[in-house]
Swiss-Prot record:
Lineage: Archaea, Methanobacteriati, Methanobacteriota, Methanomada group, Methanopyri
Molecular function, one GO term: ribosome binding
Protein name per its UniProtKB record: Translation initiation factor 6
CDD domains: IF6
Keyword Cell membrane: no
Native organism: Methanopyrus kandleri (strain AV19 / DSM 6324 / JCM 9639 / NBRC 100938)
């Protein structure tokens, strides 16, 4: 297991720039090459580079797992093509909300999603990502993809998450769930870490105790 720290042009919110699964990572063009090498090393994945809807905030805008990738409705065809060529299912989320990566907390077992997404959106998510899809919140935060992070072994969620919310995540994703923070106390763990079951890249400002908790909860030791 490899866990490394990184920032992008001084920004420790590494999860905003990169979306990753067990098999691949989608990285923004503005991410420096040395950070891309760390991603490859830590996660042991194939890396492709593209913007999403013309933005470098790939992690915030794209929801991925090993089964597929969900783009926002303003995504461009050449961006979608880059990910489709990885051989995974690709579709556009039918929603006016564009930050798809922030709307969806997923691993290869299922997904917890923003409570305001309609039934048609949930059907598309299930078709692309597979597994069970359930609406929910984490600590009063509707953008569950920003408030949580998961791999195939564990999940870490917003420290304000209730027992009921944590149980729902555990049931849907099929993993143990713990609360935690990144980058010196940020509750938005999904923004501060990129992870799969083989390793993680965490925000540069993450403290030793935070890192230890993340490693334990995500079984990265």
């Amino acid at each position: 297991m490899t866990v490394v720290k990184a920032s992008v042009h001084g920004d420790p919110n590494i999860g905003a720039w990169i979306a990753a699964s067990e098999e691949y990572a989608v990285v923004a063009p503005k991410v420096p090459d040395d950070i891309v090498e760390r991603v490859k090393e830590a996660l042991d994945v194939e890396v492709v580079r593209t913007t999403v809807a013309g933005s470098n905030l790939v992690g915030a805008l794209l929801a991925v797992n090993s089964n597929g990738a969900l783009f926002p409705r303003h995504a461009r065809e050449h961006e979608i093509r880059v990910v489709r060529e990885l051989g995974v299912e690709v579709d556009v989320l039918p929603s006016k909300m564009n930050a798809v990566g922030n709307l969806v907390l997923t691993n290869d077992h299922g997904a917890l999603v923003h409570p305001d997404l309609d039934d048609h959106a949930l059907e598309v998510i299930e078709s692309v990502l597979g597994g069970r899809v359930v609406r929910g919140e984490l600590g009063g935060v509707k953008t569950v993809g920003s408030a949580g992070v998961a791999n195939s072994k564990g999940a870490v969620v917003h420290p304000g998450a209730t027992e009921e919310e944590m149980e729902r995540v555990s049931e849907v994703l099929g993993v143990d769930v713990e609360v935690g923070t990144v980058n010196r106390g940020s509750p938005y763990v999904g923004v501060g870490i990129v992870v799969n079951s083989k390793g993680a890249v965490v925000g540069e400002d993450t403290t030793g105790p935070e890192l230890a908790r993340l490693e334990d909860a995500l079984y990265l030791i």
